[in-house]
Amino acid sequence: LKNVFVDKKIAGRYYQEAAIKAVCDSFDTRNRRKALLVMATGSGKTRTVIALCKVLSEQGWVKNILFLADRNSLVTQAKRSFVNLLPDLSVTNLCEEKDNYAAHCVFSTYQTMINCIDTIQDKEGKLFTCGHFDLVICDEAHRSIYNKYRDIFNYFDAPLIGLTATPKDEIDKNTYEIFELENGVPTYGYELAQAVKDGYLVDFMSVETTLKFIEHGIVYDELSPEDKEAYEDTFEDENGEMPDSIGSAALNEWLFNEDTIKKVLHILMTNGLKIDYGNKIGKTIIFAKNHRHAEKIYEVFGKEYSHLTGYAMVIDNRLKYAQSAIDEFSDSKKL
């Protein structure tokens, strides 16, 4: 794997090529079987690993590839990228195609693959033998994934490449141990600060806010009648008793406070990035605590901004057409 040619149409940035060559050097010169790439979100991890797969395939190192991610949407997106950039590669998404096991590049969630290696066919044995794959790619590699799905990594006898956007200094020490690396020293790293400096990514800006309940907790006697009712519904126990106040640390259970949501939405609609010469809010993602919280935010948005019909939508694993909704949101021509 010395002096390999990297397809610059797939991965043309200097750090992408450097990452590919670092993995090749690790596998070939250093005889390692595990590699960890730490690359900032938006820097092209998937493109990098696609170009790497092309290099390893052309050099005769790999034929069958397994790409694992923890969510269906990530599996779908990765498969789509492989198809677009390596159109001659036969691929399958096990989450959608349950009977196409002959493809050279298999995409799957961890749970689906666990089911596959636990399944035995009557005539031909297991769906995938332990030596079926020549390379396993683990998206968002971290200790919790490895611990939860250890059987996958123990079962397949193949080199392992981990991808993560977590800054290298924040990655759990045990994750480095999994990839047999020195703590804080990935196979290759390209982080946000460098990407911003290079002009490939834009740094984030934060808007600091002070919300009474979140910062200082809740005192029942200071609430409005409407919020008192919600407080009672939320915190009253089976004996009809409830605390006089709730500290800010306990408020994760009461993020559904309508007043808090209204204030957060007001801050967003006032200070959020605008389009159409500042006349309307641009595309925005609001991360909720859970599905119920997301539904509450959606409900409050509908009340407060009833003139913006169709502006807000809850997208999570309960939505049957979640991927289509994500695709539409990602389309710059659609709002």
Q: What is each of the regions a protein language model found here?
A:
Residues T29-R33, N100-A102, T119-D134, R150, ...:
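Short basic/glycine-enriched coil/helix segment immediately N-terminal to the Walker B
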Residues L1-N64, A69, S73, Q77-D88, ...:
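ATP-dependent helicase/translocase motor core
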